[in-house]
């Protein structure tokens, strides 16, 4: 894997810097490095593809070295270099695709394609060994079963979940009280609602709670907490739990009271915040518990009182909500996030070449399915294919 990264980095640098008019002295070190790559690869044969519709391709390396010059690089020099660069780039691209479409239930962190297995040989270590990529560093750590650490921006840690629970209901669905939520990606939105605006509740107050368990532990997380859930701030028609009917949700938004968010690890509270909004942090956690209250306003103008009558019919629903958004965090496991396209790269290649469903990943690389059942086998394979996707992205956008 590190050899593949070194190949890609050398080729990227060569493609960017070996251009007509450049002083040879400015790129002499790069050209020596490029020549070392050619010397190491010459005489070797590789085969890629042969799975799904990914065609079989044979690769033979027999290239001349780039020479030295006292002057600027001329058009002939650059054209010779370009021909070599283009072939090598095409080779790396195909090795990456071949690796991205393969999976294994056992030791999925290790190279799965014949071409990458061959590149893992000791003879290829002479190719500008470079271990500076975060993905490569973590791949090496995971390969040795040592602790890894990825930094993510808006990590897709929450499987998609959108539903509601009713703490008070009746067949007519005209006096409901409960909680509805939407968890997806890096965001939780949860709302508590009461048709009667807590008119008969103790102290005219309704208590709500929402607990979310993560599939992986997050550490050093920067989080935004807001006293609102905008996705539940407009009217909608909702299917009943049994699917037999529908009911009307017509919210009027109030500010939540006694808001508390707890971050837990293995059932132990690590961080707690009360009535604190904006930016907060959590050290390490695998569970988030949100609790908040809806309090009936003790004093109301006639217009507000008309929204929340003392008896049925209730045409509006008093609603309070919270939004929790994970802005950044560190995780030992690889995840899809907002700043990278690894999941899209892997999925698009597998779709383009009609790769059959294997023993590890769900059909279509469905992320909700994948993260919901994030087994050690999936973790190993995902880290490997994401690492390869990061290497490919250096050369192919």
Swiss-Prot record:
Q: What Gene Ontology terms describe what this protein does at the molecular function level?
A: host cell surface receptor binding; metal ion binding; structural molecule activity
Q: Where in the cell is it found?
A: Virion
> Which segments carry the region annotation Interaction with the inner capsid protein VP2?
62-73
**UniProt-listed Gene3D superfamilies:** 2.60.120.170, Viral capsid alpha domain
Q: Which domain of life is it from?
A: Viruses
Which keywords does UniProt give here? Calcium, Capsid protein, Intermediate capsid protein, Metal-binding, Ubl conjugation, Virion, Zinc
GO-annotated biological processes: fusion of virus membrane with host plasma membrane
PTM comment text:
The N-terminus is blocked. Sumoylated with SUMO1 and SUMO2. Sumoylation of viral proteins seems to have a positive role on viral replication.
UniProt-listed Pfam families = Rota_Capsid_VP6 (PF00980)
Q: Which residues bind Zn(2+)?
A: 153
Cite the binding residues for Ca(2+): 266, 286
InterPro entries noted in UniProt: Capsid_hemagglutn, Rotavirus_A/C_VP6, Virus_capsid_a-hlx_vir
Q: Which GO terms describe its cellular component?
A: T=13 icosahedral viral capsid; viral envelope; viral intermediate capsid
Entry keyword Glycosyltransferase: no
User: Repeat among the record's keywords?
Assistant: no
Further details from the record: The VP6 trimer contains a zinc ion located at the center of the molecule. The zinc ion is not essential for either trimerization or transcription activity of the DLP. Zinc-depleted VP6 has an increased sensitivity to proteases.
Task: State how it assembles.
Answer: Homotrimer. Interacts with the inner capsid protein VP2. Interacts with the outer capsid glycoprotein VP7. Interacts with the outer capsid protein VP5*.
State the family it belongs to. Answer: Belongs to the rotavirus VP6 family.
Q: What does this protein do?
A: Intermediate capsid protein that self assembles to form an icosahedral capsid with a T=13 symmetry, which consists of 230 trimers of VP6, with channels at each of its five-fold vertices. This capsid constitutes the middle concentric layer of the viral mature particle. The innermost VP2 capsid and the intermediate VP6 capsid remain intact following cell entry to protect the dsRNA from degradation and to prevent unfavorable antiviral responses in the host cell during all the replication cycle of the virus.
What this protein is called in its record is Intermediate capsid protein VP6
Give the species this sequence originates from.
Rotavirus A (strain RVA/Cow/United Kingdom/UK/1975/G6P7[5]) (RV-A)
